Amino acid sequence: MAFNKWKTGGRLKLEWRYVICPLAFLIVLWVAASFTGHWATEENPYRSYALQACAWLDGRLDLGKDYPWLELAIYEGKYYVSFPPFPSLVLLPFAAVWGANTPDHWISLGFSIIGIIYAIRLYRAITGTYEMAEQYVLFLFLGNGYLFIALQGGWVWYMAQTMCFTFSLMSLFHAANKHIGRAFAYLACAFGCRPMVVAYIPLILMLGTEKASVKTWIRKGYRLIPACMIIGFYLMLNAARFDNPFEFGHTHLPEFVRSTEGQFSLNYATKNFNQLFRLPQTGGEHGMLIYDTYDCMAFWLIDPIIVSFMVTWLYALTRKRKACGLNLIIVPATICVHLMIVCCHKTMGGYQFGNRYIVDMLPYVFYGLITYKQGVGKAEWLNNPLFALGFSINLIGTVSTYNHWI
């Protein structure tokens, strides 16, 4: 809970981490915005979800016309938003008030703050303490590639990722507390933003139903109804738009229609996997390194929390920690499945700084990290230099990329 009782007097006090962590995050975003001019108040040119919400309010599924600068699916001569639809559901009440000019950046910023709060709650649920929570949570949000998407969270690609990130943390928190219905409902919301998180169904199932009997499953099965309704909405919407309940629209993007391999192919895997190890090149002006801004680069530079996760997992594995149980297998297995799906995609995120497709994995990496660590004070020594690396590279890289300095 966010409130604790004073040791004397029985009064309530606010757990300070719920204030300090969002404040630190906002300060960093303010600094980045002050160098780039990308404030939350600026107009959003990539407002695909707002346009879709307005179309729904007008009683139509397609957008009515082409917007050449947006990634639209073209099917039977009509133009559709090609991304999974859940963010448009969130924007419906805002579109009813503001039309297509919804406050997208503010909405995504709000989701980031909610995500920070749930990351703290998840840490408390797993470790049983708030001690060191601020270090792990700020490592997750500021020391990795999330910073790049958070600065322009209203853009269509980043709004979906911001919401998916938060819904993933919410799903993990409720699964850790055995609220299986809410856990799968939030995972269904995350799936409606970034479908690749379907890989984590086994993890949420294991975490949320640990030690549950078949009789308990039968008695509480109704709790899965909200998740089933959300998935049912996706299936019906897809069928109504593309005559295929499993098609969100990306297959009908011109770039994938023209591709002989399509959107997903095993033929992409080797090339994309190798890009996860791509280092900055030498030979820049005045001795500077040359950082790539298309697809991705070395994951340990952009998302060093993964390095901490891997080291801590190996530590837990060699110690044969019974307390970790199936987490030693299911967490890395589901992350590897997610990674394989990502590598089989035609692109690795296009123009960006870092590895934005890998960002979707980080809530689950965070869960694994705090699950494996051998008590407070045992694993934290590695996080400080890794946080320094990730924070400095991502902050400078984010500012440089948005300013087109690199």
Locations of regions flagged by a protein language model:
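Membrane-proximal envelope and lipid/glycan-remodeling enzymes
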Residues: 1-406
